[in-house]
């Protein structure tokens, strides 16, 4: 990892209480920007172009969070309809940037993008999807892990191993309680942190990563491994604290050191915006959601406050 020349670029290391996150999509953010050269639009190089960086900087953003950039295929049901997977929440290559976002510089364009944001004092956070893969359910394609060791990499029904536990709503669930699978996830995170100088991660359906055979455990294998890792434990770690599995809603339940998407903040602010009588709840959310984060050594910054994101409606559509 240290063989890459980062030209003395250093991570900004923004304190959590001062962090302002901007969720963005590499292609969606750049593909129509006339200030970016046509050959760079829709690419990592376009995302790292001066026009992109200066705009984000002008907003007062401290951390840009990129929607999934791990390699992902287009689902067959989309291809059959002449469509493509735009968001990218169906990863398969956990160690490879999505080549569809490559510009003329290839993978170096990703590193150049990260360096451009670091030089501007802005962190780069990746939205990562380790909870499921693009291989789908028992009717889905065998692209990688199914063929390597199906029962190791995926959680299957105890009495019918042909069928997958579907706590993700996508057809399969990655078995992060298996030591080799956990090792793969940790190796992937270290690769992005060290070789690509990423400053943090937002974990899609993060509850799944903490679900052990007996249920969700904030002291479980995944959380324990991250806490003990000398590199990852120093990064910004943000969980989406829910899934559709048993006990899946875990807002306020992640371990110390983690931030969480706070949907109670989102919903309360939108209700207040509409004129609903939620003044007390609104005040509690603005003051740090102490009912959720004033325990177990957690801090107000653990609440990642947002009103809208890539999921759901725009604010005016509430």
Please annotate each region the language model reported.
Residues 13-18, 57-58, 230-232, 297-300:
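Extracellular/periplasmic catalytic domains that process cell-envelope and extracellular macromolecules
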Residues 27-197, 202-228, 273, 292:
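Substrate-binding/active-site clefts of carbohydrate-active enzymes
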Residues 2-8, 47-50, 184-188, 282-296:
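A Trp-anchored, charged/polar loop motif used as the substrate-binding/catalytic surface
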Residues 1-23, 30-39:
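The feature marks proteins involved in alpha-glucan
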Residues 17-27, 58-63, 91, 171, ...:
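Extracellular structured ligand-interaction cores
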Residues 19-20, 62-65, 121-123, 199-200, ...:
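Beta-sheet entry/capping signal
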